[in-house]
Amino acid sequence: MSEDSQRNFRSVYYEKVGFRGVEEKKSLEILLKDDRLDIEKLCTFSQRFPLPSMYRILVWKVLLGILPHHQESHPMVMEYRREQYQDVYHALQVIHFISEATPKIEVFLYMYHLETGKLSQSQPYPMEPEDDIFLAIASTMEEMVDDDVDCYWLIRNFVNHFDSKFKDSKLQLHKAFEHYLNLEDSRLVAHLKASSALEKLPYDLWFKKCFAGCLSASSLQRVWDKLVSGSCKILVFVAVEILLTYKLKVTALNNAESINKFLEKIPEDNTDPIVSKAIDLWHKHCGIPAHSI
């Protein structure tokens, strides 16, 4: 039996006995053994599979450019990141901009503004729409990441990554959502149009905040795996699956305000299956990347 055949046989066996993901974890560990990490293969892996929790932060830091490709440099670079974090944090303390009572996600926002030259001296502090997006993402990232330094750098680079890499793609998400929802359930689209709700769905929550504050952090990290590794289209299929999952509830509502209000606060206890089905939908419509090793 060839090596590929053995791998396929083991994958099927593990899935049947309830150990789906064992082979995937082994594949990732092989990728992470190389001193020079292969970014393309890490991206492909992240597109195909959910990242194991024990490796997620490391992979995200590499894919978001917080850590370099060469692993031997990781300790030195991370020490530099830590020092930079402490310098910016201390600067905010010196100018009495933050205190021990300042909420952590607000500290992260002020640090980001100081680094990017946007820190305002006005009081109360002026909040722009993009700041609300930053805070929403920061709040969810804080639930995912224990270390403050890691958390800040991941928030900072995630926001920059989403704004720069997907600058053009973001403009198409609204249309793509309507297209794929219509393919899956045209009657549901017709109901949304008849209720004048289609143009008033919580698109900012979905496509700007990347579902931060909508899905539980434990579910959302599997969606963000796909974002970090290069696909913002996954957001479309999460939105589509939310509508499909709550079709009966949505079709029982007949005005835009009530539909929007419900979709902004969906029950968090059902978000894991929604994400799993959304990823399946994404693979169904967009294909599955070739195996990473």
UniProtKB/Swiss-Prot annotation:
Q: Please identify the protein, giving its name as recorded.
A: TBC1 domain family member 7
- Keywords on record: Cytoplasm, Cytoplasmic vesicle, GTPase activation, Lysosome, Membrane
User: What range(s) does the Rab-GAP TBC domain occupy?
Assistant: 50-231
Q: Name one GO cellular component term.
A: lysosomal membrane
Is ATP-binding set as a keyword in this record? Answer: no
One Gene Ontology term from the biological process aspect of the record: negative regulation of TORC1 signaling
Q: What the protein does?
A: Non-catalytic component of the TSC-TBC complex, a multiprotein complex that acts as a negative regulator of the canonical mTORC1 complex, an evolutionarily conserved central nutrient sensor that stimulates anabolic reactions and macromolecule biosynthesis to promote cellular biomass generation and growth. The TSC-TBC complex acts as a GTPase-activating protein (GAP) for the small GTPase RHEB, a direct activator of the protein kinase activity of mTORC1.
Q: Which domain of life is it from?
A: Eukaryota
Which organism's genome codes for this protein? Xenopus tropicalis (Western clawed frog)
Its chief place of residence is membrane
Q: Does the keyword Membrane apply?
A: yes
Localisation per UniProt entry: Lysosome membrane; Cytoplasmic vesicle; Cytoplasm, Cytosol
- Which SUPFAM superfamilies has this protein been placed in? Ypt/Rab-GAP domain of gyp1p (SSF47923)
Q: What is the lineage of its organism?
A: Eukaryota, Metazoa, Chordata, Craniata, Vertebrata
